[in-house]
């Protein structure tokens, strides 16, 4: 906050900086503000919550993942709310501000997924999420259902702030950042069926408003050294927190990951490549992770003469909502897999080696999933995969490491959109710091891990050599691999 100023003979408690003003002027249903540290996100959020406090039945909610994280936000409201509304009262037991009109702003948390049911039956005209990437999609979407009016003439909307990273990084990026350039309104038409059979169509809007420390002149004036603090961070954190880079963030498991369209053809210094014809003598693997309410995942991999694996096709049982399965039973999944292999020229007529989550062989509650899928007419055969988690994670690291020639030992066709979406977004578990967080959308990771464990690599002997930046003959661009 800038030093106190006067306007019309009255003190100015707070005034928005340009990026904050852009955020607060938006009219969409959902707005995400941020992308980097120090942009003044939290200040804008707690001030935005005041917009309707003159309406007696207005109810607002500001939420963080855990309650201790709310302390700073509550301190901000003490600094801002009381001078503007001297008769407003904060109740430390209920964590609620009550304003002279009767309007209320609550502070809440959702430390565990089941905590979302603490808000069951509640209605909030405004919901503000601070650090949205700390929440799962299930938590966010449930609270969206609580975003409804408490009476006439209130505006009903949600606002959120975030930095890259955290368990929710993937879905937040997919919902707000990836679909459109920053500052571009996204429109979604949603449908519902009325009891009389009528189809009701409504319009939902959302937008991402970026912000970095460079947008916070007040902070840089009060603490010029903060810019240096961010610039001195390790590279991944620096990219995320200084520049708001959503492709690099703290806690990312596979920091080796690189998706460079400029090298899709020469296959160097990128894990994503353009599809090519698979030679007939290459071995084909099929990995499988079963899911019902969560997505199931099938990946097909080709192995070349050097032991390099290529993910050439995928089948992902997702509704389009992050981490939500299509609820297909085991036999239907087997039929979908068989149809893919019969219709895809890369797979038709091939001998395919299937490896799957050992859990599908469980017979404790009747016929196993593996047995159901092996029956006529699908005849899918699976071998139980090696479920050793840390060894499997290390195989991922070994495979993703670039060799001296710029080629890794695992590459992915650019048609495998869900692999490309989910693998870079995996973060470490807070309780088991060597493993990934299993509450994420990790189904593709699991089925790939089973295939990697069937084709283990030794640790790379040497660090990869990065290409020389000075390449006047453009030899790197001209190099290309041809398949015969």
Residues covered by each model-derived region:
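ATPase catalytic-site recognition across NTP-hydrolyzing enzymes
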Residues: 215-288
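Walker A/P-loop NTP-binding motif
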Residues: 42-56
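Pre-P-loop entry segment of helicase/translocase ATPase cores
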Residues: 1-29
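Conserved RecA-like ASCE P-loop NTPase motor core of nucleic-acid helicases/translocases
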Residues: 58-70
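Mg2+-dependent endonuclease catalytic cores in nucleic-acid-processing enzymes, primarily RNase H-like
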Residues: 307-437, 456-468, 473-484
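Walker B catalytic acidic pair
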Residues: 130-131
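Inter-Walker segment of RecA-like/P-loop motor cores
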Residues: 69-125
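ASCE P-loop NTPase helicase motor core
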Residues: 134-216
């Amino acid at each position: 906050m800038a030093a106190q100023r006067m306007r019309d003979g009255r003190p100015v408690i707070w005034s928005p900086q340009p990026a904050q003003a852009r955020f607060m002027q938006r009219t969409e249903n959902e707005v995400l503000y941020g992308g980097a540290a120090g942009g003044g996100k939290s200040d804008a959020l707690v001030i935005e919550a005041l917009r309707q406090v003159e309406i007696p039945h207005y109810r607002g909610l500001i939420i963080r993942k855990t309650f201790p994280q709310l302390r700073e936000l509550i301190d901000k409201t003490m600094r801002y709310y009381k001078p503007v509304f001297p008769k407003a009262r904060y109740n430390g037991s209920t964590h609620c501000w009550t304003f002279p009109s009767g309007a209320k702003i609550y502070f809440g948390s959702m430390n565990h997924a089941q905590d979302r049911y603490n808000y069951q039956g509640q209605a909030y005209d405004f919901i503000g999420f601070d650090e949205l990437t700390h929440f799962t999609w299930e938590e966010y979407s449930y609270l969206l259902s609580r975003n409804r009016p408490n009476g006439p003439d209130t505006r009903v909307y949600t606002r959120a702030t975030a930095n890259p990273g955290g368990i929710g990084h993937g879905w937040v990026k997919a919902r707000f950042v990836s679909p459109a350039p920053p500052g571009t309104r996204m429109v979604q038409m949603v449908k519902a069926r009325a009891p009389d059979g009528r189809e009701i169509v409504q319009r939902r809007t959302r937008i991402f408003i970026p912000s970095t420390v460079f947008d916070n002149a007040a902070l840089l004036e009060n603490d010029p050294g903060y810019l240096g603090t961010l610039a001195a961070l390790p590279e991944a954190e620096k990219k995320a927190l200084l520049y708001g880079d959503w492709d690099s963030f703290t806690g990312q498991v596979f920091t080796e990951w690189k998706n460079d369209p400029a090298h899709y053809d020469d296959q160097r210094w990128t894990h994503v490549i353009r599809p090519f014809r698979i030679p007939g003598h290459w071995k084909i693997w099929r990995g499988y992770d079963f899911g019902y309410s969560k997505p199931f995942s099938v990946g097909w991999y080709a192995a070349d003469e050097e032991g390099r694996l290529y993910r050439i096709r995928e089948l992902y049982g997702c509704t389009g909502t992050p981490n939500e399965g299509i609820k297909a039973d085991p036999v239907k999944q087997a039929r979908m897999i068989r149809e893919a292999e019969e219709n895809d020229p890369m797979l038709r007529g091939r001998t395919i080696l299937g490896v799957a989550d050992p859990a599908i062989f469980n017979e404790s509650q009747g016929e196993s999933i593996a047995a159901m899928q092996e029956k006529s007419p699908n005849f899918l055969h699976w071998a139980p995969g090696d479920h050793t988690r840390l060894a499997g994670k290390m195989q991922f690291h070994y495979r993703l490491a670039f060799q001296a020639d710029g080629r890794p030992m695992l590459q992915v066709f650019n048609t495998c959109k869900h692999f490309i979406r989910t693998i870079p977004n995996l973060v470490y578990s807070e309780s088991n710091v060597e493993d990934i967080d299993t509450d994420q959308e990790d189904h593709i990771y699991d089925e790939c891990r089973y295939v990697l464990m069937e084709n283990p690599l030794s640790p790379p002997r040497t660090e990869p050599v990065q290409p020389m930046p000075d390449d006047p003959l453009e030899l790197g661009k001209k190099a290309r691999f041809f398949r015969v």
